[in-house]
Swiss-Prot record:
Superkingdom: Eukaryota
Compartments reported by the entry: Plastid, Chloroplast
GO terms for biological process, alphabetical: translation
Record-level GO cellular component terms: chloroplast; ribonucleoprotein complex; ribosome
Species of the source: Brachypodium distachyon (Purple false brome)
Protein's name in the database: Small ribosomal subunit protein uS11c
Lineage, highest ranks first: Eukaryota, Viridiplantae, Streptophyta, Embryophyta, Tracheophyta
One GO MF term: structural constituent of ribosome
């Protein structure tokens, strides 16, 4: 007669901690680089900052949402500033190029925060995509 094999563990998964803290605990520790490129993408709803090395490999990224801002507060200039400070402090940059894309309200605040942080900026480039009379824009909102 066959002997029953005892089960180790159960099928139910036990959730440890809260859901909102799960993202921060899963994040890898960022590589520390001295020279890199800071990409600032400022939309009307959010500000996303990506730090890459000179070859273009992503080292760290941060957005207003990951810094703790929700809903319409993500679009504020203060959220853009906090996002920029968070991204630079984590990586420890000394020299950088800045690529700015978009026309959101966090754009200037993020740029000001990067300049004040002590990082030497070699160039600031605006890479906002501009159509050469391409697609028809959406109709204006009527509120």
């Amino acid at each position: 007669m066959a002997k029953a094999v005892p089960k180790i563990g159960s099928r139910k998964r036990v959730r440890i901690g809260l859901r909102r803290n799960a993202r921060f605990s899963l994040r890898k520790s960022a590589r520390r680089i001295t020279k890199g490129v800071i990409h600032v993408q400022a939309s009307f709803n959010n500000t996303i900052i990506t730090v890459t090395d000179p070859q273009g490999r992503v080292v760290f990224w941060s957005s207003a949402g990951t810094c703790g801002f929700k809903s319409s507060r993500k679009a504020s200039p203060y959220a853009g500033q906090r996002t920029a400070v968070d991204a630079i402090r984590t990586v420890g940059l000394q020299r950088a190029e800045v690529m700015v894309k978009g026309a959101g309200s966090g754009r200037d605040a993020a740029l000001r925060a990067i300049a004040k942080s002590g990082v030497r900026l070699s160039c600031i480039r605006d890479v906002t995509p501009m159509p050469h009379n391409g697609c028809r824009p959406p109709k204006k909102r009527r509120l």
